[in-house]
């Protein structure tokens, strides 16, 4: 019996045989116009989307060609690198250099990679967020931030100088969330055409949420104020918060970001008492910054517990930061506990 073959795709009731939604490429062309910095930004985003389309093809093949999770080295912070980490880094760097960017800062390289000498934008990127989930069917993603390259150290600028930011989520569909400073846009990759088509515009977070995303196994290591926040939430409608909360934790910042951008919620990964976690764990430049940019564009907030992420001036390329993001009201409430 043939289990798979060259069959036509499944068509559901209500499906259209033609995707007519605007492509991200067309949107970016219209946004950029003749502005040189905008054109450079658009070209960088297009390069990332091209890489995402190629990367998802390898992710989908799993272990068939070889082990994508094979350990092949360590990065600047001595985190173990998998084969797919290095491969995705090389892929995006190659495409971004071809797109004319000035420099690329990747989680997988100690120093920025030089690009075009007169390039107008610099790209900070985590080529494959959540690579610990490789082979498990759990979320993976690519997250990026684009800065003007008009200063000597473009990656040591505060996040409020970002021109654009976004992420690609590799799940049961390949979804893009991005902003060029004019609201958050969602798009989905059509595997037939190879194009990302826009599905939602001006995405906004709700005013209130009862969904929390954090690693509950480290609660005992949190500060007294943060433990009080968690305990009060877990008391539900019988506690001081007066309502029940749900908990979600996907183990990849892009996965949690994508869910929160669609359904609302609050994510936190803050500093705690464990060695190596004193300043938080996520990287400020290419994880916290793009998330904070998107949260702001969607009407939410992002802080390190007390300070707006977008106001923090990085001191090093791979600086770590605590991160709290999501629905603005809940970010503010957590902030009151954080400083206790």
Swiss-Prot record:
SUPFAM superfamilies, per database record: Carbohydrate phosphatase (SSF56655)
EC id: 3.1.3.11
Subcellular location: Cytoplasm
Binding site for substrate: 215
Cellular component GO terms held in the UniProt record: cytosol
Cofactors that this protein relies on: Mg(2+)
Catalysis performed (reactions): beta-D-fructose 1,6-bisphosphate + H2O = beta-D-fructose 6-phosphate + phosphate
UniProt GO molecular function: fructose 1,6-bisphosphate 1-phosphatase activity; magnesium ion binding
Binding site for Mg(2+) 1: 107, 126, 128
UniProt cross-references to Gene3D superfamilies, sorted A to Z: 3.40.190.80, Fructose-1,6-Bisphosphatase, subunit A, domain 1
UniProt KW keywords: Carbohydrate metabolism, Cytoplasm, Hydrolase, Magnesium, Metal-binding
Cofactor, how bound (note): Binds 2 magnesium ions per subunit.
Domain of life assignment: Bacteria
Pathway: Carbohydrate biosynthesis; gluconeogenesis
Enzyme class name: hydrolase
Recorded family membership: Belongs to the FBPase class 1 family.
Cross-referenced PANTHER family: FRUCTOSE-1,6-BISPHOSPHATASE-RELATED, SEDOHEPTULOSE-1,7-BISPHOSPHATASE, CHLOROPLASTIC
Protein name: Fructose-1,6-bisphosphatase class 1
Organismal lineage: Bacteria, Pseudomonadati, Pseudomonadota, Alphaproteobacteria, Hyphomicrobiales
Gene name linked to the record: fbp
């Amino acid at each position: 019996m043939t289990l798979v073959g060259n069959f036509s795709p499944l068509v559901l009731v209500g499906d259209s045989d033609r995707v007519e939604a605007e492509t991200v490429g067309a949107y970016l062309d219209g946004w950029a116009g003749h502005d040189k910095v905008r054109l450079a930004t658009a070209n960088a985003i297009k390069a990332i989307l091209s890489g995402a389309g190629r990367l998802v093809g390898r992710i989908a093949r799993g272990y068939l060609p070889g082990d994508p999770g094979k350990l092949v080295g360590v990065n600047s912070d001595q985190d173990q690198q998998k084969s797919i980490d290095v491969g995705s880094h090389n892929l995006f760097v190659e495409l971004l250099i071809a797109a004319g960017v000035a420099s690329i800062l990747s989680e997988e390289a100690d120093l920025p990679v030089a690009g075009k000498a007169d390039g107008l934008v610099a790209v900070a990127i985590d080529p494959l967020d959540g690579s610990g989930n490789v082979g498990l069917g759990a979320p993976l993603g690519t997250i990026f931030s684009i800065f003007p390259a008009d200063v000597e150290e473009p990656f040591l600028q505060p996040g409020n100088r970002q021109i654009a930011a976004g992420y690609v989520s590799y799940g049961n569909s390949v979804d893009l969330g991005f902003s060029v400073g004019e609201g958050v846009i969602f798009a989905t990759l059509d595997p037939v055409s190879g194009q990302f088509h826009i599905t939602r515009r001006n995405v906004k977070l709700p005013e209130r949420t009862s969904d929390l995303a954090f690693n509950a196994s480290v609660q005992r290591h949190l500060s007294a104020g943060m433990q009080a926040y968690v305990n009060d939430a877990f008391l539900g409608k019988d506690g001081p918060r007066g309502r029940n909360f749900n908990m979600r934790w996907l183990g990849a910042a892009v996965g949690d970001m994508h869910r929160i951008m669609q359904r609302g919620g609050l994510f936190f990964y803050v500093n705690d008492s464990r060695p190596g976690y004193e300043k938080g764990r996520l990287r400020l430049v290419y994880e916290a910054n793009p998330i904070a940019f998107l949260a702001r564009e969607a009407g939410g907030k992002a802080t390190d517990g007390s300070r707006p992420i977008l106001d923090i001036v990085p001191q090093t390329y791979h600086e770590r930061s605590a991160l709290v993001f999501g629905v603005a009201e809940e970010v503010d409430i957590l902030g009151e506990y954080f400083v206790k």
